[in-house]
């Protein structure tokens, strides 16, 4: 799957927001559970691959200051509109997980509901470095990706538990790991990790 800005912009231009396969129509249930339980404390949040902005809007509603980035300008506009329609303000801008437009050690919590798993393998270490760079010491990172238990090869890459451990163990400590499925119409099988910056 490509991570070209032009390709993603075309997807958003050619697909109604409700028909986007990753548009669950609301915040990710695992994110909501962790925030409501206080596992993820309120602070400065970064929503990577914000898309329609449902997770960002949820975080704003629960007291977070939110920066939402997406590689598609149309997605950024959509997220900004969804926040505005809810009477909320977040800072939304075009951005790339491989070169996050945020200063060092600025973020308390980073959320990624399905951006990392579209990266080509050579780009993944750079993305890990960028997420680590923008987080404050002991900052939290919630990652959700397609798991190797999801059949087929279309769409995002599938990950094994070992691949995820190998990618993140040098810079993050895994606090929680669980299997599940993405919310939305297709419900693909997922792995989720809540990590803390080392």
Where are these predicted regions, by residue range?
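Short catalytic micro-motifs in class I SAM-dependent methyltransferases
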Residues: 114-118
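Class I (Rossmann-like) S-adenosyl-L-methionine-dependent methyltransferase catalytic domain
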Residues: 1-102, 119-130, 134, 139-198
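Polar/charged side chains located within well-ordered beta-strands of beta-rich proteins
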Residues: 111-112, 192
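A short acidic, Gly/Pro-enriched loop at the edge of an enzyme's catalytic core
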Residues: 102-110
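Conserved acidic functional residues
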Residues: 55, 112-113
């Amino acid at each position: 799957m490509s991570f070209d800005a032009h390709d993603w912009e075309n997807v958003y231009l050619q697909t109604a927001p409700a028909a986007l396969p990753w548009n669950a129509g609301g915040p990710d249930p695992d994110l909501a559970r962790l925030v409501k339980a206080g596992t993820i404390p309120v602070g400065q949040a970064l929503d990577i691959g914000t898309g329609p902005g449902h997770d960002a809007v949820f975080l704003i509603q629960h007291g977070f200051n939110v920066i939402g980035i997406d590689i598609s300008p149309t997605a950024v506009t959509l997220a900004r509109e969804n926040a505005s329609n809810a009477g909320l303000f977040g800072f939304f801008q075009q951005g790339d997980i491989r070169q996050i437009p945020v200063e060092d050690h600025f973020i308390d919590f980073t959320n990624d509901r399905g951006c990392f798993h579209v990266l080509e393998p050579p780009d993944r270490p750079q993305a890990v470095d960028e997420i680590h760079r923008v987080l404050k010491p002991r900052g939290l990172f919630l990652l959700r990706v397609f798991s190797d238990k999801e059949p087929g090869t279309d769409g995002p890459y599938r990950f094994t538990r070992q691949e995820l451990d190998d990618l993140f163990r040098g810079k993050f400590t895994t606090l929680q790991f669980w299997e599940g499925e993405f919310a939305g119409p297709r419900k693909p099988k997922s792995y989720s990790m809540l990590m803390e910056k080392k």
